[in-house]
C-alpha cells in the first residue's frame, strides 16, 4: 500500500503545476487543461484520504467531480470552438466579447 504522504505530495505537486498553468498562461486551451489538472489533483487526494480512512465516500465524491468536470469540458470546448470561429484566436487577452 502506498503511504498517504506520497499521495498527498503527488496531489499537491499536480495542484501547483495546474495553478501555475491557470495563472501564468494566456492560451485558453492551456488554461482549460491546467484547470483539469487542478481538479484531478483534488480527486487524487479524495481517493487517498478515502483509502486511508477506509471510507468509500472519497471515491464517490471523486466520481461526482469527474462527472461535473466532463460537463464543464463539454461546455468549455463548445465555447472555444465558437470563439475560434469568430475571433480566430485562443489568447485570453484578445478575447473582448463581453466588454461593453
UniProtKB/Swiss-Prot annotation:
Enzyme's top EC category: translocase
Location relative to the cell: Cell inner membrane
GO molecular function, one term: quinone binding
Stretches that traverse the bilayer: 4-24, 28-48, 60-80
Reactions performed catalytically: a quinone + NADH + 5 H(+)(in) = a quinol + NAD(+) + 4 H(+)(out)
Predominant location category: membrane
Disulfide bond annotation, renumbered to this chain: none
Keywords, alphabetical: Cell inner membrane, Cell membrane, Membrane, NAD, Plasmid, Quinone, Translocase, Transmembrane, Transmembrane helix, Transport, Ubiquinone
Record-linked InterPro entries: NADH_UbQ_OxRdtase_chain4L/K (IPR001133), NUOK/Mnh_C1-like (IPR039428)
GO CC annotation terms, alphabetical: NADH dehydrogenase complex; plasma membrane
EC numbers: 7.1.1.-
BP-aspect Gene Ontology terms: ATP synthesis coupled electron transport
Pfam families: Oxidored_q2
Record's bilayer topology term: Multi-pass membrane protein
Function: NDH-1 shuttles electrons from NADH, via FMN and iron-sulfur (Fe-S) centers, to quinones in the respiratory chain. The immediate electron acceptor for the enzyme in this species is believed to be ubiquinone. Couples the redox reaction to proton translocation (for every two electrons transferred, four hydrogen ions are translocated across the cytoplasmic membrane), and thus conserves the redox energy in a proton gradient.
Family as reported in the entry's similarity comment: Belongs to the complex I subunit 4L family.
Subunit structure as annotated in this protein's UniProt entry: NDH-1 is composed of 14 different subunits. Subunits NuoA, H, J, K, L, M, N constitute the membrane sector of the complex.
Protein name: NADH-quinone oxidoreductase subunit K 2
Organism for this UniProt entry: Sinorhizobium medicae (strain WSM419)
Lineage: Bacteria, Pseudomonadati, Pseudomonadota, Alphaproteobacteria, Hyphomicrobiales
Amino acid at each position: 500500500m502506498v503511504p498517504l504522504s506520497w499521495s498527498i505530495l503527488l496531489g499537491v505537486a499536480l495542484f501547483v503545476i495546474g495553478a501555475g498553468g491557470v495563472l501564468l498562461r494566456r492560451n485558453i486551451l492551456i488554461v482549460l487543461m491546467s484547470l483539469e489538472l487542478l481538479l484531478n489533483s483534488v480527486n487524487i487526494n479524495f481517493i487517498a484520504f478515502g483509502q486511508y480512512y477506509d471510507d468509500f465516500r472519497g471515491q464517490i465524491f471523486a466520481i461526482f467531480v469527474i462527472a461535473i468536470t466532463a460537463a464543464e469540458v463539454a461546455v468549455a470546448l463548445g465555447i472555444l470552438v465558437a470563439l475560434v470561429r469568430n475571433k480566430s484566436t485562443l489568447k485570453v487577452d484578445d478575447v473582448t466579447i463581453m466588454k461593453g
